[in-house]
Structure formats: structure tokens, C-alpha cells
């Protein structure tokens, strides 16, 4: 499967897969994740499902993927609370563009995935809209200040959730991150 780069909005999105796909897989990515993207797509391709995979680059993770503003948990960079803007970019630009360019059916099953803060973004996005058929959150940043209270009051609207959590956070000396355990 050959990957191509497609400019959507002002972002160079990496696209791999087939037109008329049954599944649209969206992954918010950082530069460091692009190196393993080919392997990830190859693993997904082993399923018998037709899919289109789109890696959407995120420049400022702490701002673009955080659902609300929060102080720094480590280092000096806090969280900008711009997840709403990122979700609008997905729903108003990325998804319509991919549906049109790759002739995806109206009922294409859209799965949003991410790792770390992008995993938290995926979980949060599923509380904001019923657009997503599924969510894949790998080691999501559920330690994020206020997340536990938020998720108890805002149910997910997705049909399927894949969630994987590590066990290192609970052993850290950082009290915010240790709350995960």
C-alpha cells in the first residue's frame, strides 16, 4: 500500500488505503510517529476490511489536543485547551475532503485513534459527537487535570472503544500522573 501526502487545510496529511473504503481511520500524529506509520498500516492491512488511513499532523500537542486549559504537569509548557478547534478541523475539513477525494460512502465507519495526549483527545472527541464509529486510545493521558470528573459526567457517544493503559504512570513521582493507577 503506497502512502501519499495530501494537503488538507494547512496540514500535510499522510494518506494510505483505498477509495470506496468501508473504514476511515484517523490518527492524530507527531513527527516522531510518522517513522512507524508504514508498519502500522501494514498491520492494519492484514484485516479483511477495506480502509483509508489518514495521519493528521499536530504541531503543538499540548495546545491542540487538550480539551481545556491546564497548567504544566512537567516542564514549563501548559495546555492550551484547543481540542475544540482540532475537532472542528477534523469534522469540517479532513473528513469531508477525504470523503470527496476517495469517494467514501456516506455511512463510512470513522475510527479516531491516538497515542498519549492524542489518545485523550480521541476519548474527549467521542463525548462531543456521535460521528465516530470507534475510538482507539493507546496509553491515553487520562491523568490530565479534571479528566476523571469530566468523563463521569459526559458519556462517550461511540459504539466501540479500544483502550490500552500502561502501568508506569502509577509508579511515577509526578502526583498528577500517578493518579492514573
Regions found by a protein language model. Give the residues of each.
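Serine-hydrolase catalytic machinery in alpha/beta-hydrolase-like enzymes
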Residues: 9-12, 19-103
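The conserved beta1-alpha1 loop
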Residues: 26-30, 139, 165
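Short helix-loop-beta connector
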Residues: 105-108
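Gly/Ala-rich beta-loop-alpha elbow adjacent to hydrolase catalytic centers
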Residues: 113-118, 122
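Aromatic pocket-lining residues of Rossmann-like dinucleotide-binding sites
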Residues: 125-126
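A conserved short beta-strand
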Residues: 131-143
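The feature captures the conserved acid-bearing segment of alpha/beta-hydrolase catalytic domains
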Residues: 141-181
Amino acid at each position: 500500500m503506497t502512502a501519499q501526502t495530501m494537503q488538507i487545510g494547512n496540514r500535510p496529511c499522510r494518506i494510505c488505503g483505498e477509495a470506496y473504503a468501508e473504514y476511515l481511520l484517523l490518527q492524530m500524529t507527531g513527527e516522531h510517529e510518522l517513522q512507524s506509520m508504514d508498519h502500522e498500516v501494514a498491520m492494519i492491512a492484514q484485516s479483511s476490511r477495506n480502509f483509508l488511513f489518514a495521519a493528521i499532523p499536530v504541531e503543538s500537542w499540548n495546545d491542540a489536543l487538550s480539551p481545556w486549559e491546564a497548567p504544566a504537569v512537567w516542564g514549563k509548557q501548559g495546555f492550551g485547551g484547543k481540542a475544540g478547534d482540532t475537532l472542528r478541523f477534523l469534522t469540517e475539513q479532513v473528513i469531508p475532503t477525504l470523503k470527496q477525494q476517495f469517494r467514501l460512502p456516506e455511512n463510512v465507519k470513522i475510527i479516531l485513534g491516538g497515542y498519549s495526549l492524542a489518545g485523550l483527545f480521541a476519548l474527549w472527541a467521542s463525548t462531543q459527537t456521535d460521528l465516530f464509529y470507534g475510538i482507539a486510545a493507546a496509553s491515553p493521558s487520562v491523568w490530565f487535570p479534571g479528566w476523571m470528573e469530566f468523563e463521569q459526567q459526559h458519556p462517550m457517544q461511540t459504539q466501540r472503544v479500544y483502550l490500552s493503559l500502561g502501568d508506569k504512570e502509577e509508579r511515577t513521582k509526578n502526583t498528577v500522573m500517578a493518579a492514573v493507577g
